[in-house]
């Protein structure tokens, strides 16, 4: 059965005023990748490119999305993997949809395409969002940097991670969008003061998840001596004990871990009072 494009039962929507895109075959040599918002090509990316090239079919090749820039070049918004694969196969031109937009809109388009299709990692989306000056991304970056840490816009291997590097982008974003940027700054500041051995593992999701969500439970927590809380009981010990309780009582790990830190923070507040 063949169906037409039928939308007569839906209310029409008027799109934003914008120039119509152009369709063309663009020389691969004129396509460039803007590292301000595009993801870098690591080993996994190159493996994917080689797989596309090894079984290249035009029937599977969606036109790349480009924006014209100075010098007669085209910034690649979406499709750098396909473009690289075509180059490996010796094709000098690729089909493209060309849209005239600013660099900020290029970055926003990258975020939209890769967020809706779930192809980019959270750090990669953050990188593009910062380039596009998206408010949420700037707020996330600033909340982390205010604590002397760095919100990472690309992944690293475990061996290459350093103390103060925060990869928990989704956690930070959720807290910031929930009005808890203060908790991100307070929690990370305490970790930096507590960590006198530059332990990268302290800034992993394993620790940051329960710790930052615990700090965020109450604005009063920011007034407590959070450094003393961390020094009073090793964070790993807190999490391990919480996991045992969760197993015995059949409770969710995330909630039990968070509540364990909440109890320690509140107890520190009572002692200080």
Question: Where do the protein language model's features map onto the residues?
Answer:
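Classical N-terminal secretory signal peptides
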Residues: 1-3, 272-273
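Short alpha-helix boundary/capping and kink motifs at helix termini
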Residues: 2-77, 81-88, 92, 97-100
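Solvent-exposed functional surfaces
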Residues: 91-273
